[in-house]
Amino acid sequence: MKILVMNCGSSSLKYQLLDMENNKVLAKGLAERIGINDSLLTHQAEGKEKVKIQRDMKNHKEAIQLVLEVLVDKEIGVIKDMKEIDAVGHRVVHGGEYFTDSVLIDDEVIKKLEDCIDLAPLHNPANIEGIKACQQIMPGVPMVAVFDTAFHQTMPDYAYIYPIPYEYYEKHRIRRYGFHGTSHKYVSMRAAEILGRPIEELKIVTCHLGNGASITAVKNGKSIDTSMGFTPLEGLAMGTRSGSIDPSIVTFLMEKEGLTAHQVVDILNKKSGVYGISGISNDFRDIENAAFNEGNKRAMLALKVFAYIAKKTIGAYAAAMGGVDAIVFTAGVGENGPEMREFILEGLEFLGFTLDKEKNRVRGKEAIISTEDSRVKVMVIPTNEEYMIAKDTEKLVKGIK
């Protein structure tokens, strides 16, 4: 079975074509600047050079048409006919309380996704546009929605309810939802496989640390708490997001700086985090370079703040689960940042591990980076959200065939 996985952002489209018979990625790529001038498609077929194609893409439909064109192209394509695509798996950011698992898409599902637009105004409209465009271009091909929020729907009510008047939850569904669910689910399952133990008996803290960052407590295979909340702005300090701060800072800044609420939230989303503290960049590599090689104090402070909040969260989740068997690092910084991993883990040894500094040098590869005799295993597991989306899609489509 060949499955096309799509991840539509507001002006971008990431895709992978996977052959599920042998779990191979046949091709992958990225369409950028959709609806803006200078649109660009970067495409790479397995075993071939990367190809860059500049062509105007006014909307997601035109981008998807171009993607399908290159997939069947004689020179750079990997399939002879569009009909070889058995199903399409769509990443959807917010499924609200409607979806606890991936679903086959029909009109009813689309209606519910539209109901969730208020909860994810930046992401859901693009996700829906991508789904509708695919339905038009590929009628009859099964489509599946895989949600960032679904994995966290197993959280108990005391973990997701905010201590504000309960009527706001009833009226507006204000609660913790959590994100990066597909990634947390994949790395927790993979950790159990590597450890050779059933996930149903493990307590795992998964750390998805990239430009967006979140940590999840996975107990017996289920998410019981996660650091992102009603939106992806809560929790850890991130590339440009503040993470959790005192809410009254919003009104204080509005008064002192003459800003609207919308402007303050924009600052908290786009100008804060390690970028806000360092004043350099939202890229951890730039900040680490400034901190370690140039002695930049604010860059070092940004790294320390990021590591400190992550450290506290790992400790809190070990407490919430009544212990921990494994701590897993994934995503850009988690997979490729030995220094940051060491920063975060320093002082957490009381949980039952010793970091092996030699093994911790690993970048972008699966590894156990704690010492052999550590009771708690510390692991690096590169995330593979596309594979997870394809797996869920395959499972649902096989169910209807």
Curated annotation (Swiss-Prot):
Q: What class of enzyme is it?
A: transferase
Q: What residues does substrate bind to?
A: R91
Q: What GO biological process terms are annotated to this protein in UniProt?
A: acetate metabolic process; acetyl-CoA biosynthetic process
Listed under catalytic activity are: acetate + ATP = acetyl phosphate + ADP
Pathway the protein acts in: Metabolic intermediate biosynthesis; acetyl-CoA biosynthesis; acetyl-CoA from acetate: step 1/2
> Which EC number(s) does the record attach to this protein?
2.7.2.1
Checking PROSITE patterns in the record gives: ACETATE_KINASE_1, ACETATE_KINASE_2
PANTHER family assigned to the protein according to its UniProt record, in alphabetical order:
ACETATE KINASE, ACETATE KINASE-RELATED
Cofactor annotation:
Mg(2+); Mn(2+)
NCBIfam families reported for this sequence: ackA (TIGR00016)
Give binding positions for Mg(2+).
N7, E385
Q: Where does the entry annotate site (Transition state stabilizer)?
A: H180, R241
**Where in the cell is the protein located?**
Cytoplasm
Q: What is this protein called?
A: Acetate kinase
Its main subcellular localisation, reduced to a broad class, is cytoplasm
Q: Name one GO cellular component term.
A: cytoplasm
Record note on cofactor: Mg(2+). Can also accept Mn(2+).
Binding sites annotated in the UniProt record for ATP:
K14, H208, L209, G210, N211, G212, D283, F284, R285, G332, V333, G334, E335, N336
Q: What does this protein do?
A: Catalyzes the formation of acetyl phosphate from acetate and ATP. Can also catalyze the reverse reaction.
Q: Which family is this protein grouped under?
A: Belongs to the acetokinase family.
Q: Name one GO molecular function term.
A: ATP binding
Q: Which domain of life is it from?
A: Bacteria
Recall the taxonomic lineage recorded for the source organism.
Answer: Bacteria, Bacillati, Bacillota, Clostridia, Thermoanaerobacterales
What keywords appear on the UniProt entry?
A: ATP-binding, Cytoplasm, Kinase, Magnesium, Metal-binding, Nucleotide-binding, Transferase
Quaternary structure and partners: Homodimer.
User: Which Pfam families is this protein grouped with?
Assistant: Acetate_kinase
